[in-house]
Curated annotation (Swiss-Prot):
Protein's gene: lepA
Keyword annotations from UniProtKB, A to Z: Cell membrane, GTP-binding, Hydrolase, Membrane, Nucleotide-binding, Protein biosynthesis
Biological role: Required for accurate and efficient protein synthesis under certain stress conditions. May act as a fidelity factor of the translation reaction, by catalyzing a one-codon backward translocation of tRNAs on improperly translocated ribosomes. Back-translocation proceeds from a post-translocation (POST) complex to a pre-translocation (PRE) complex, thus giving elongation factor G a second chance to translocate the tRNAs correctly. Binds to ribosomes in a GTP-dependent manner.
Protein localization: Cell membrane
Pfam families with a match to the protein in the record: EFG_C, GTP_EFTU, GTP_EFTU_D2, LepA_C
Organism annotation: Desulfitobacterium hafniense (strain Y51)
tr-type G domain sequence ranges: 6-188
InterPro entries assigned to the protein according to its UniProt record, in alphabetical order: EF-4 (IPR006297), EFG_III/V (IPR035647), EFG_V-like (IPR000640), EFTu-like_2 (IPR004161), G_TR_CS (IPR031157), LepA_C_sf (IPR038363), LepA_CTD (IPR013842), LepA_IV (IPR035654)
The protein, known as: Elongation factor 4
Plastid listed as a keyword: no
Length: 601
């Protein structure tokens, strides 16, 4: 093994959202002088405006720091920043696989949260050296001793040497860097064996093609090397290799233990899947690195342009986003109510939200979104098994044997005062209680099995509002379970509006149908004729409301006179309205499609 790799340390930062991860990364960059004071800005590793505004990390970033340690050596520290949100767990697991150590950041006031725990388990699975850091100790409400105790009780790490720091004021930054040098082991690996490099991220550059962020585990890679992707077998010629400072800097080669990027004129990000192994095309490794899997979308929804002439622009925008985000899937679909659009699949709700916001903001599109749905497995009577992500594609009732829905295993951390409120919420959401653990006298973790379809609507908002914002949630897919599910359709003036259909549990179908038609009655504007709104399951109408017609007072000119004269005028008006109703079409406002999401409000 090359002596040089003894001076390399690869580490990442893991934390719950808002515990100060990006700010700490800023301080480390500033302290080691990777960027000058002039180039520094808040959250320097968060490139998107959206990331800065929401204060979240979506795409993971990487930076190489040169640190002259107290022992006289200069070390190369590769910091791999990870997203903190549950939707991006797979990205976190891949970036942790590229490291030997991790800084565990815990907020001195809030203590351990659900996502902290989930990411710690990922780090332990990858056998990383974990260094606990208690951040925000400058806050008046900081309780470092309590948090130390929590780290020991909940995670089982020795917190006696936990570093007390404040990323905001710069306290403890040198201690953190020294701890990384002292505790994180140097990378193992031989420069002279066949190349094995783990892709932990990729993005698309208009000039260089898809660029892979890699951690070289074995061997070396330089410009001109022929590389092969082990999952697809595709071969490319390397045009450039380099490091991150955080900007890309070209170097001659990157070798075992180092983190860098590879550009090889790859036309499509789909060819550089996160978690895949790159090897030398001529002198190939026998086995890929473990842990690769394709990202599977969990939540689907329809995206339609408000102005149908924007369909082409929407297609271009989705394709451009897909270049940078291979977990986004989309295919064209048509709706009788909304025209042409796309059915899109996302990793989770935040992912869906972020993509929609980027489409509207970066590509200036005005979109209508249909209610999100999950992938159901339908076992038909003839033995065929279908995966349905769009309620409109559900087969007829008499062809269905059973419908299975995706189930998630949720861990909810709350102060013990709110346990009752959370149990009540989970009961409403058809949750199945597994067990609960007391982390301390006043903090509890509840373990539940919940249907994913109940989480995708407003579960997170409800969770926060019922616990005054104190609850934190982490979930993972736990398979499928058969359930009594039905498709609820909406008829407007006798016409089916496919974009308003959704799949719902039978027990809740009547109540939801009732609430939906009431909501739609308030949203759909009055027409010149009466508009019935019906919620139907199969052939059966379960709820109905009517939008009353606007009518002219045809009796205004009759002062007194014969009743039969008045009746004749009213009958004539009624006949006219009837004819209008047969040919009239109802304009559906955009709010109507959002009403499905907000039925429970």
């Amino acid at each position: 093994m090359a002596q040089a790799s003894q001076c390399i340390r690869n580490f990442s930062i893991i934390a719950h959202i808002d515990h100060g991860k990006s700010t700490l990364a800023d301080r480390l960059i500033e302290y080691t002088g990777a960027l000058s004071k002039r180039e520094m800005e808040a959250q320097v590793l968060d490139n998107m405006d959206l990331e800065r505004e929401r204060g979240i990390t979506i795409k993971l970033q990487t930076v190489r720091l040169q640190y002259p340690a107290k022992d006289g050596q200069t070390y190369e520290l590769n910091l791999i920043d990870t997203p903190g949100h549950v939707d991006f767990t797979y990205e976190v697991s891949r970036s942790l696989a590229a490291c030997e150590g991790a800084l565990l950041i815990v907020d001195a006031a809030q203590g351990i949260e659900a996502q902290t725990l989930a990411n710690v388990y990922l780090a332990l699975e990858n056998n990383l050296e974990i260094i606990p850091v208690i951040n925000k100790i400058d806050l008046p409400s900081a309780e470092p001793e309590r948090v130390k105790q929590e780290i020991e009780d909940v995670i089982g790490l020795d917190a006696s040497e936990a570093i007390l720091a404040s990323a905001k004021t710069g306290i403890g930054i040198e201690d953190i860097l020294e701890a990384v040098v002292a505790k994180v082991p140097p990378p193992q690996g031989d420069d002279n064996t066949p190349l094995k490099a783990l892709i932990f991220d990729s993005y698309f550059d208009a000039y260089k093609g898809a660029i892979s962020y890699v951690r070289v585990m074995e061997g070396r890679v330089a410009k001109g090397t022929q590389i092969k992707m082990m999952s697809s077998g595709k071969v490319f010629d390397v045009t450039e290799v380099g490091m991150f400072t955080p900007a890309l800097r070209i170097v001659d080669e990157i070798k075992a233990g180092q983190v860098g990027y590879i550009a090889a004129s790859i036309k499509n990000v789909r060819d550089t899947q996160v978690g895949d192994t790159i090897t030398d095309a001529e002198n190939a490794a026998l086995y890929p690195l473990p842990g690769y899997r394709k990202a599977t979308p969990m939540v689907f929804c329809g995206l339609y342009p408000v102005d149908s002439s924007d369909y082409g622009r929407l297609k271009d925008a989705l394709e451009k986003l897909h270049l940078n985000d291979s977990s986004l899937v989309f295919e064209p679909e048509t709706s009788s109510a909304l025209g042409f659009g796309y059915r899109c699949g996302f990793l989770g709700l935040l992912h869906m939200d972020v993509i929609q916001e980027r489409l509207e903001r970066e590509y200036d599109l005005n979109l209508i979104t249909t209610a999100p749905s999950v992938v159901y497995k339908v076992n038909k009577t003839d033995g065929e098994v279908l995966s349905i992500d769009n309620p409109s594609n559900l087969p007829k009732v008499d062809e269905i044997e059973t419908i299975e829905e995706p189930i998630v295993k949720a861990n909810i951390m709350v102060p013990s005062d709110f346990v009752g409120a959370i149990m009540e919420l989970n009961q409403e959401k058809r949750g199945n209680f597994l067990n609960m653990d007391y982390l301390s006298a006043n903090r509890v973790t509840l373990h539940y099995e919940l249907p994913l379809s109940e989480i995708v609507y407003d579960y997170f908002d409800q969770l926060k509002s019922r616990t005054k914002g104190y609850a934190s949630l982490d979930y993972e897919l736990a398979g499928y379970k058969a359930a009594s599910l039905v498709k609820l359709d909406v008829l407007l003036n006798g016409e089916l509006v496919d974009a308003l259909s959704f799949i719902v549990h039978k027990e809740k179908s009547y109540a939801r149908g009732r609430r939906l038609v009431e909501k739609l009655r308030g949203i759909i504007p009055r027409q010149m004729f009466e508009v019935p709104i019906q919620a139907v399951i199969g052939q059966k109408v379960v709820a109905r409301e009517t939008v009353k017609a606007m009518r002219k007072d045809v009796l205004a000119k009759c002062y007194g006179g014969d009743i039969s004269r008045k009746r004749k005028l009213l009958e004539k008006q009624k006949e006219g309205k009837k004819r209008m109703k047969q040919v009239g079409s109802v304009e559906i406002p955009q709010d109507a499609f959002m009403a499905v999401l907000k039925i429970d409000d």
